[in-house]
């Protein structure tokens, strides 16, 4: 970390609201070095307007699509570099459910470790209910139609369909998770980024943005992700 540098988390909803003000956009552009996204980007090349990046279909963007679209637009207009950690990169370093059991065990049943495990379980169960809800249903909560039951089984259950319904406990069938949040956090550290991440560079108005869709050493990176969390609970 350079002297004076800070990492500040923010939702796209809050950031979009902040950037509505021209004076705040000016302040933001002067103070912020780059913005990390927990999700990917799609590149659009128009012969008239040039190149731009828009949010891809990552689940994180579906909670407030309008806000995500505004954030992407503002950041490119302000020439603030974006680093987008895509689901393709996360899929290269999947974590097994047993990792959370090991985390709780190694931490001697630390309440925060238990909370991490419970949050992972509740999160995947909620996504299961959204994915199995009918197209157009309010239960899907803006989840794209292609994120359906078949997608869920393929992505999280290794394609092994035990014919569970939306009301069944899906947790025993989960083979792995995609560690978006852990991966994005690690990507914030320059030495880790240069060592493990392989971004695609997209230039917009003379500014280089990075879409991270590959990692260089998946198994080594997975070990690092686990070890960082294990170490966090050492006495």
Q: Across the structure, where does each feature detected by a protein language model lie?
A:
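N-terminal acidic, glycine/proline-rich low-complexity segments
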Residues: 1-235
